[in-house]
């Protein structure tokens, strides 16, 4: 779920 997920960025 990147890069639109903050915890993945």
From Swiss-Prot:
Keyword list, A-Z: Amidation, Disulfide bond, Ion channel impairing toxin, Neurotoxin, Secreted, Toxin
Main location: secreted
Annotated tissue distribution: Expressed by the venom duct.
Residue(s) carrying Asparagine amide: 9
GO molecular function: ion channel regulator activity; toxin activity
Keyword Ion transport (UniProt): no
A cellular-component GO term for this protein: extracellular region
SS bond list: 2-8
Subcellular location: Secreted
Family, as annotated: Belongs to the O2 superfamily. Contryphan family.
Entry's free-text remark on domains: The cysteine framework is C-C.
Function in brief: Its target is unknown, but this toxin may modulate voltage-activated calcium channels (Cav) or calcium-dependent potassium channels (KCa).
Protein known as: Contryphan-In1172
Organism of provenance: Conus inscriptus
Taxonomic lineage of the native organism: Eukaryota, Metazoa, Spiralia, Lophotrochozoa, Mollusca
């Amino acid at each position: 779920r990147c890069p639109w997920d903050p915890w993945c960025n």
